[in-house]
């Protein structure tokens, strides 16, 4: 009986001790250490193989597999079990998104086999993912597992309709190597509300631009048959505030493309620009704004020929297909027409100051007004030559959006001020012209009396011939330029 009692007490004490050990393990980090030791012991009995997926290939172009692995891993529930995970706010304020941190491990299972992914980073800052898989499982699951990643990431990409705006960063000397390895693009969500439905533009021109873009979207086989790169380029030119940037946003929303906004002030030279363009993805709109301003101020070592040569050079065939390139300028008169020939720039679209048709579109968009008793007065002022940019008129309407009548009166006052300014300018020009012509007449009379005739060789006639020759040169240059926007309007 005593032996049984002793055995019972020993069992009771052992059970209590195990219970205390269990509590100790779960309440402290010892359980983590036990799991870690267990994993290391198992690893001693298995041979593993490692596969690295770098973010960029040897040509510094984006590795699409890296992006697919990135999307796939961040969708795994096991990311919560990683030792270090980043938390971000999602689209909704109460939504929390988990992202794997650098040099952290996340586990996954496929067809009964366990694999691990390491979010790595090399010494030079190049990012990568490393797949750790048992050699015994490699032949059985590797191919189908990678295909599984492709399938899941494609489904995630289709559900994620968020567009992105990519911005290039500059090269700092102490981070030169690292930034080149990591890429020079940084992205933010692109949610610009502008569309072709609410943009102020002539209806016929808008419809023809939309038709041109739709033809481009369906043109992959056509471009391949012609042996041309599947891309298209646009030149948008006109004064500031006429809607060029809004038009780019409308294009991106219509095409459902990401946007790459190139800041030339952060580009070192033509070679650096080419490397930037090589790192862009397909299905994107690549924008270089205010091109003439950058070139005139010499704020960058990039030149116009270097930019436009890329669009029709052999190197452009090495980049992703299905891209739209857009250049914006305030005017193209100072640009050599050969620089803007077809093949380099396919479509030229002029953005003029606001006219009455565009004004009615703005009034409808900003004020919800399609007709108003003051419209006839506004139309008359436009017909007299007054004009403002759509941005200026839009700001007046926003400031007075609670009262359409007050907003229209402010627009009328601004237009009248502009008309008076233009009228004063024309009068001064006419007065200066009449004074100049009078002085030239006196000069001709004096030269005739002194030289005994010979009016054909007088300085005034020479100046007139020189001016006439200059006008002929400018006229010939203008007639030789290729402007699809004008063709669209005439057609």
From Swiss-Prot:
Any one GO cellular component localisation term in the record: membrane
Region ranges (Disordered): 423-460
Membrane topology summary: Single-pass membrane protein
CDD domains recorded: RecA-like_BCS1
A biological-process GO annotation: response to stress
Domain of life: Eukaryota
Keywords linked to the UniProt accession: ATP-binding, Hydrolase, Magnesium, Membrane, Nucleotide-binding, Transmembrane, Transmembrane helix
Names of the cofactor(s): Mg(2+)
EC number from the UniProt entry: 3.6.1.-
Catalysed transformations (reactions): ATP + H2O = ADP + phosphate + H(+)
Signal peptide: none
Family statement: Belongs to the AAA ATPase family. BCS1 subfamily.
Name listed for the protein in its UniProt record: AAA-ATPase At2g46620
Species for this entry: Arabidopsis thaliana (Mouse-ear cress)
């Amino acid at each position: 009986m005593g032996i049984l009692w002793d055995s019972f007490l020993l069992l009771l004490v052992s059970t209590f001790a195990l219970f205390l050990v269990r509590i100790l393990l779960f309440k402290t980090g010892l359980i983590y250490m036990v799991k870690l030791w267990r994993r290391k012991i198992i690893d001693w009995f298995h041979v593993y193989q490692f596969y690295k997926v770098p973010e960029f290939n040897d040509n510094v172009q984006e590795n699409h597999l890296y992006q697919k692995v990135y999307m796939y891993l961040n969708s795994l529930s096991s990311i919560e079990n990683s030792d270090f995970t980043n938390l971000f706010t999602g689209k909704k304020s109460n939504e929390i998104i988990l992202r794997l941190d650098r040099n952290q491990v996340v586990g996954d299972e496929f067809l009964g086999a366990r694999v691990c992914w390491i979010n790595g980073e090399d010494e030079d800052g190049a990012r990568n993912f490393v797949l750790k898989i048992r050699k015994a499982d490699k032949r059985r699951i590797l191919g189908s597992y990678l295909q599984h990643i492709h399938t899941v990431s494609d489904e995630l990409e289709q559900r994620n309709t968020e567009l992105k705006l990519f911005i290039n960063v500059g090269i700092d000397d102490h981070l030169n190597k690292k930034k080149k390895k990591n890429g020079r693009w940084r992205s933010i969500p692109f949610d610009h509300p502008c569309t072709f439905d609410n943009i102020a533009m002539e209806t016929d021109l808008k419809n023809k631009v939309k038709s041109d873009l739709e033809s481009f979207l369906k043109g992959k086989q056509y471009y391949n048959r012609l042996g041309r790169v599947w891309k298209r380029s646009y030149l948008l030119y006109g004064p500031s505030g006429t809607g060029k940037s809004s038009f780019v946003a409308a294009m991106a929303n219509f095409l459902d493309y990401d946007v790459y906004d190139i800041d030339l002030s952060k580009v070192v030279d033509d070679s650096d620009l080419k490397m930037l363009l090589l790192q862009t993805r397909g299905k994107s709109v690549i924008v270089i704004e205010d091109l003439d301003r950058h070139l005139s101020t010499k704020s960058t070592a990039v030149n116009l020929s270097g930019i436009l040569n890329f669009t029709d050079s052999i190197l452009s065939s090495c980049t992703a297909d299905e891209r739209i390139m857009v250049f914006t300028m305030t005017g193209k008169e100072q640009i050599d027409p050969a620089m803007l020939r077809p093949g380099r720039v396919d479509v030229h679209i002029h953005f003029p100051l606001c006219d009455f048709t565009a004004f009615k579109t703005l009034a409808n968009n900003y004020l919800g007004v399609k007709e108003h008793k003051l419209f006839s007065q506004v139309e008359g002022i436009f017909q007299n030559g007054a004009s403002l940019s759509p941005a200026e008129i839009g700001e007046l309407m926003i400031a007075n959006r609670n009262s359409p009548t007050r907003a229209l009166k402010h627009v009328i006052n601004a237009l009248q001020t502009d008309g008076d300014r233009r009228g004063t300018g024309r009068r001064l020009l006419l007065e200066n012209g009449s004074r100049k012509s009078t002085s030239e007449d006196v000069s001709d009379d004096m030269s005739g009396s002194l030289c005994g005739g010979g009016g054909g060789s007088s300085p005034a006639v020479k100046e007139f011939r020189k001016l006439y020759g200059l006008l002929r040169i400018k006229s010939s240059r203008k007639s030789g330029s290729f402007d699809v926007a004008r063709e669209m309007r005439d057609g």
